Amino acid sequence: VNKFTYGIRLPVINTKIIAINSPQRGDVMVFRYPEDPSLDYIKRVVGVPGDTVSYQNKRLTINGLPVETTKVFDYHHPERLYYSEQYVARMGDVEYKYLNDSDAPAFIPDATRFPFRENCTYNAAGVICKVPDRHYFVMGDNRDNSRDSRFWGFVPERNIVGKAFFIWLNLSSPSRIGSFK
């Protein structure tokens, strides 16, 4: 994790003293989990402050524009005996793969109360959220098996740890160990 990509913070009090960059759509970001800041989470940034993020019927749109996606070969989960639909998506200069399970519902039944919850509308097809100032909307690349902003809300800027750029250890996909992002 590059802790300086988004700025330099004072230790202990976590105050940003030098702003360098802001998280961009498509970045893989490490942050302190909003519901328990003692835990670090890693997710992909899909919405930045001011964006309207819509995830309806498993289709992601940002500010009314669908995220460019292409279906590729299905992904086999070696530890479970099933396949997920796999897609390649592009956000700006970032291209990445994500998974969808065609049998999983788009509806999010157990979204909790969270700050700025009023910025989100939940319906049978999914969720639409307006990202507040100094907050980010993040999603996991394994969409139907990810607890992310759809469930627990936005990531405050103050919770950002840094930008992920190197895969240190991935036991489920050893070929990715040591690769750069």
Descriptions of predicted regions:
Residues 1-181:
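Soluble "head" domains of membrane/secretory-pathway proteins
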